[in-house]
Amino acid sequence: AVSIGDDEASRLIREHFPKLQAPELKYHALARRPGYRQPLIELQRAVLSQHMCVTYVCDKRFLLILMFLDYAVEPFYYERGEDFYKDGQNYALASLLYTVGPTLLGTAAFDDLLVAFQRAVKAKTPQALDALVNAARKLNWPELPEALGPIALGSPECLSAIATPGVSTDAAMVVLQSLTTRMEVMAAGPYRVEHDQSENLLTYHDLLQRYIRHEDVVTFRQSEIASITFPLKLQSVTQIDSKHSP
């Protein structure tokens, strides 16, 4: 996310890509051409040094493991009165799984577990849920029973959470929430967002509008260093064709 006007964006594009004939910048297309790599770096340097920016880097595999813990582990502990999220335990356990899981459990088998989890969340059928439980049981799960025991033992709380309508492994909303959290911190007052046309944004348009319209004063703290306060300073989110806006 970059706080920049169309005129300034056009000027930077002309300055760093004077020979470019395309109506819009496409990173993947430019990055494939060696002659454009240095201008890309210089453009990024100019934007980062001269304008307010929010950059969000997401490791999708780590995020998937976090989601696995949210739905295939946490409900088991909640049912027994344990706060799985206390002191960032979910992040610590996700980091452990991400780092040692492939070595301790076998790379292929661990990958199969994550794939089975994605399929179970998407399909929500008894067959897909059984396949997830079987994938967990094929692992040497007693090596990490606190993370793998609930699903390996077929915890009904976890299976019910995974089968809940609306539960998804889509990372788009996580990214949107993270960007919004940081933009709220950086913005001195009301602001609006213009976004390139996106199916993901259309999917979450109604939810974003509910966020924007929320008037009750409340703060949600995601971690020790991240929180978001309502009402938002964000006033609107609109989609535009990037061919018509630099």
Where are the predicted features?
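A two-mode feature
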Residues: 57-246
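An N-terminal structural lobe/cap that precedes and organizes the functional/catalytic core
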Residues: 1-33, 38-55
